[in-house]
Amino acid sequence: MSSTAQIDSALATAISGEQIAGLVAVAADANGPIYQSAFGRRNIADSQRMTTDTVFRIASMTKAITGAAAMQMVEQGKLSLDQPAKEILSFLADTKVLLGFDSQDHPILRAPRTEITLRNLLTHTAGFVYDTWNQAMHKYAQVAGLPAARTGKLEALTAPLNFDPGERWEYGINIDIAGRMVEQV
């Protein structure tokens, strides 16, 4: 069996159950695509076939691209993993840590104990979180009139931290801010 036939067989098997409606696979080298094929349906509830030009919403794929771009900038000496991020993005100089809310629902904020670095941003240890999954940050966004991160508005990147940089890990808008650093440089 040829390599292409083996790949086709494996992918056809992958969609044969009810777990995956359909998929598109592409392999490329420096000269362009060397394999591409589509299998299954675009939607479990729909009979429309998957094609190699089907448009997907692939959440968080920009994180890998942003991480690679940031590390290329580090290799080139244009960014440093441990440089204070506010040296590149001045708006980060005003970033505070959200401690909670007072009895009138005003945010209680303080300055972070450590600097936000590119390393923190790339490892989700800067203190930024998603308002979707963090109740305190969701409340802050409502009280402060801050747009949700999912809107793609740059103002969403001005949210406060949920904890001090380097204190712990939490998934959030960190990579979006790292992406702004790459853009700025």
Residues covered by each model-derived region:
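Short amphipathic alpha-helical segments
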Residues: 4-12
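Conserved beta-strand->loop/alpha-helix structural units within folded catalytic cores of enzymes
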Residues: 66, 184-185
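A short, well-structured edge-of-sheet supersecondary motif
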Residues: 12-49, 81-83, 137-140, 144-145
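Active-site-proximal loop and beta-strand segments within enzyme catalytic domains
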Residues: 44-170
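Short, low-complexity N-terminal intrinsically disordered segments enriched in polar/charged residues
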Residues: 1-2, 166
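Short glycine/serine- and small hydrophobic-enriched flexible loop segments
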Residues: 71-76, 176-184
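Basic, Lys/Arg- and aromatic-enriched nucleic-acid-binding interface segment
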Residues: 173
